[in-house]
Amino acid sequence: MKTSPLTLLLGAALTLSGASLQAAPADTARTAAWFEAHKDRPPLLRQFLQRMPKGADLHSHVSGAVYAESYLGWAAQADLCVDTVRKSIQGQSCGTGEGQVPASKLGSAAAAAMVDRMSMRNLDQAGRSGHDQFFDAFSVFGPVSDLPGKPAAMLAELSNRAAGQQILHLELMTTVQGGAVRRLGGQLAWAAEPDLARRHQWLLDHGLAALVEAGRHDLDALDQDYRQQQGCDSARPQPGCGVSVRWLQQTTRTNPPEQVYAQLAYAFELAKADRRVVGLNLVAPEDHPVALRDYRLQMEMIGFLSKQSPQVKIALHAGELVLGLVPPEHLRHHIRDAVELAGAHRIGHAVDIGFENDGFETMALMKQRGVAAEICLTSNDGILGVRGREHPLPDYLAAGVPVVLASDDEGISRIDLSHEYVRAASTYGLGYAQLKQFSRNSLEYSFLPGTSLWQDAAQARVVSACRRDVPGAAQPSPACAAWLQGSERAGRQWALEAAFERFEQSPQWRRPALRSRGRGL
C-alpha cells in the first residue's frame, strides 16, 4: 500500500547522517554556555534558536498560519476582486462597484493595507482591539483559502517553513466536511436536557458514516495534491516533505448545540477511521456568547463521546480569556472543566488559570495526568493583552505542568515558532536546558501513535529496549531498532535526538563569545 506523505514514515528516524553519533555531555554543556553568553543579543539569540531542533508545533490553525501575502497572490491567480473600501476579498471577479480592484492590479499601498487587514501588523493603526482584529481576519481570507488546490498550497507553505526551522512534526487544526456535518446536525431535535446517547445513535443511523468516508476522500485528495505540488516523489522534493503532518478535526464552538454535537461526534468517528486524524479541538472565540453559554454542555458532550471512543485524543482551547473581556464568573472553571469533564490531553492557551476557583489544584491535576499546556505567547499578547509577568508560563513550569510552545496563527501574528522560543527565552530568562525540554515535550505530548522513547522524559531516561544505545544513533541495536519501528512517536523522538546531537556538535558553539568593542555594548 502506498504510504501517505502526510503520515510519519516509520523508518525516517533511522535514515540520518551516516556519521556515528556519540553521547557528548561536553557538547551539550558547551552549547548551553554559548547560549548563556549570547542570549542578551537578539540577532544571535534568533540565529541560535532558528537552528535549534524543535520537535513539533502542536497548536496551529492552517488558515491562520498562512501569511497574507500568499492569500493576495492566490487571489490574483484566481482573478478575484478586492474591495479596497471594505478591505475584503470577494469570491469572484470584480464588477462595477466602488473601490473594486482585481487582486492582480492592487497597488503597493492597497496591498499593504490588505496585509494589515489580514494580520496584526500595524495594529496600533487599526482602530480596533487586537481581539477583534485577529478573529475578523479569518473572514477576509476565507474566500481564498476555500479555492480548489489551495489547501495543498497552504500546507506546503507551513511544512516548508517548519522544515526551515528544524521542526520535525506538525499537528494542524482544520475542518473536514464541515458544512455537511452541520447540516446533518441541524436535523437533530434538541432538548434542554438532551439524551446524548440517543442523539449520538441518531447521527450514526442517519449518515455520519458516509460523511466520514467523504472526509477520508477529501484527505486523500489533499494528500495527493500536496505530494504533487511539493515533488515529494521526485529527485528534488521540497523540504516540507520531510516534516510529518497530522490533523486535528475542528468543531466551531459558537454554533447551535445540535450542530456542535454533530461536529464532535463526526470528529471522533473520523479520528477512529483515519490515522491521519489524531484528535479534535474546539475553535472560535471562547468569549463568544454562545461559547460561554454552552461551555459546560460542550465539555459534557466531549466527555460522553470520549467514553465511547477512549482511543481518540483531545486538545481543547480553554482559558483563552482575561478579566474585562468577560465577567469574572466565566474565568472560574473553563480549564478545570476541560480537564475533568472533557478529559482533555492538552490545553491550548490556559491563560486564566489565576482566576480559576481551584487554580492550584487544577495545575496539580494537569501535572498528575500529564496534561500539557500549549503556550502561545505572541497570540496571548495580541488578543488578550497578557504578556510578561502577567502570563502564567512561569507558574505552569513551577507547578511541574508539562509545557510546549506553539505558534497558534503565525500568519496572522506575523511570527513563526522560532520567534516563540526567542520570546520565551528573552522574557523569562530561560536557559538552554529548558528550551530543549520544550522541544522534547512537543513530541512527548504529541498525538502520534505508539509508546514514548522516554521512560522518564523529564530526566531523559530512555526505555529499557534502548538503554544501551545513544539516543539518535544512526545504527541502533536490534532491540532498540525493533522498538522504534513499532512506535511512530518513538521514531520521531529518536530523529529529534539525532538532530540535537548534530546541532550541539556544531563548531560554532566552540568559538569565543561574539562581543563588539563598540561604545555602549
Regions inferred by a protein language model and the residue ranges of each:
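Metal-cofactor-binding active-site regions of metalloenzymes
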Residues: 23-521
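Bacterial N-terminal signal peptides
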Residues: 7-17
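Positively charged n-region of N-terminal signal peptides that target proteins for export
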Residues: 1-5
